[in-house]
UniProtKB/Swiss-Prot annotation:
Subunit structure and binding partners: Homodimer.
Organism of provenance: Oceanobacillus iheyensis (strain DSM 14371 / CIP 107618 / JCM 11309 / KCTC 3954 / HTE831)
SUPFAM superfamilies in the record: PLP-dependent transferases (SSF53383)
Gene Ontology MF terms in the entry: histidinol-phosphate transaminase activity; pyridoxal phosphate binding
EC number(s) on file: 2.6.1.9
Gene designation: hisC1
Protein name in the entry: Histidinol-phosphate aminotransferase 1
Pathway where it operates: Amino-acid biosynthesis; L-histidine biosynthesis; L-histidine from 5-phospho-alpha-D-ribose 1-diphosphate: step 7/9
Catalytic activity: L-histidinol phosphate + 2-oxoglutarate = 3-(imidazol-4-yl)-2-oxopropyl phosphate + L-glutamate
Keyword set, alphabetical order: Amino-acid biosynthesis, Aminotransferase, Histidine biosynthesis, Pyridoxal phosphate, Transferase
Cofactor(s) needed for function: pyridoxal 5'-phosphate
Family matches, as Pfam families: Aminotran_1_2
Family assignment from sequence similarity: Belongs to the class-II pyridoxal-phosphate-dependent aminotransferase family. Histidinol-phosphate aminotransferase subfamily.
Length: 354
């Protein structure tokens, strides 16, 4: 700890991302990246945009906002763009949550929420999940300061139906409810359908998962224009140019290339079902995921042991040393070839040769 650090730098507990090893032989199934590359149209758009890198990007990102708005049948004043959904989440904490007013989020959820709460001095009311790892909807009513949770939840992958989200919104009319939809394109209906009916709803999505653009950092929020203005006020107090030219160009084309998006998301959903079936035959317990990952535990093999053994054999999965998750591994959905290699390695670990 440095004597030059501020009290804030000393107090925060930074988020710890999944391992990123500089080794192309490693099969990465630990950070929920898309196993398929961006489409050729996206690559071409990025290449074309690189010719103007001497120029600043658009501070308002109007073209991308318009594309996202059109995708959901909304005007661009309902859309906010940020440098990845984590940045959008950070701006949202600053825009809508007040120190002293406790916000609600699930006990098992995205690890950045408690980090931001501490960073921005936001009090919290952490809600335990039900025994089946579902969200106890009624416990999210009548919050002091607001509500935030992912849907599907992370790392469980469990999806909360839209009518349940509507009940949470109806029971928090004076507080902002943030639905973090990083994995929604592998699931069912988005809460964006409720935006026009509920001025207190903010939906946050990302281009990192279903659009294969984790390396470009594009996230966005969808909500009432008054909420979007609040986000813009915070953003422009930090940096008017949070999104670069290459990211804007790639994101626009990723939205326009609907056929490729449908092909890749369909393949991932099919692979998710296949992996679930295969792991069940190997005596794994698996939560009902609608994301691009599975949260699994084995009846006999310790999760940390399985994580370490897979790592030794060139496969990275995610192990969380946290209460309630000690017996689980989170496995990102890879290509069919990656999945077969994973299953082969698992068989070697759980059924060692005599």
């Amino acid at each position: 700890m440095s004597k030059f650090w501020s009290s804030l730098a000393k107090q925060v507990d930074p988020y710890i991302p999944g391992e990123q090893l500089n080794d192309d032989t490693i099969i990465k199934l630990n950070t929920n990246e898309n196993p398929y590359p961006p489409s050729n149209q996206v690559i071409q758009a990025i290449d074309e945009a690189s010719k103007n890198l001497r120029l600043y990007p658009s501070p308002t990102v109007d073209e991308l906002r318009s594309e996202i708005g059109e995708m959901y049948g909304l005007s661009q004043d309902h859309i906010f763009i940020g440098n990845g959904s984590d940045e959008v989440l950070a701006f949202s904490f600053m825009s809508f949550f007040e120190p002293g007013n406790r916000i609600k989020y699930p006990e098992i959820t995205y690890s950045f929420y408690p980090v931001y709460a501490k960073l921005f001095n936001i009090s919290t009311d952490v809600i335990p999940l039900n025994d089946d790892y579902t969200i106890p909807v009624e416990h999210f009513y009548n919050s002091e300061g607001g509500v935030i949770f992912p849907n599907p939840n992370a790392p469980t992958g469990i999806f909360l139906e839209i009518d349940q989200i509507k009940r949470i919104l109806e029971n928090n009319p004076n507080q902002v409810v943030i639905i973090d939809e990083a994995y929604i394109d592998f699931a069912l209906e988005s809460a964006v359908t409720l935006v026009e009916a509920f001025p207190n709803l903010l939906v946050i999505q990302t281009m990192s998962k279903s659009r294969s653009l984790a390396g470009l950092r594009i996230g966005f929020a969808i909500g009432n224009p008054e909420l979007i203005i609040g986000l813009e006020r915070i953003k422009n107090s930090f940096n008017s140019y949070t999104v670069d030219r290459l990211a804007i160009a790639g994101a626009i084309e990723a939205i326009r290339d609907k056929d490729y998006f449908l092909q890749t998301t369909t393949k991932i959903i099919e692979s998710r079902s296949y992996l679930k079936e295969q792991l069940e035959t190997r005596h794994f317990d698996i939560l009902p995921s609608q994301a691009n990952f599975l949260l699994v535990s084995h009846k006999e093999v310790n999760a940390e042991v399985l994580y370490q053994e897979l790592k030794k054999q060139g496969i990275l999965v995610r192990y969380f040393q946290k209460p309630g998750l000690e017996n689980f591994l989170r496995i990102s959905i890879g290509t069919p070839a990656q999945i077969e290699k994973l299953l082969k390695k698992i068989d070697h670990i759980i059924k060692p040769s005599p």
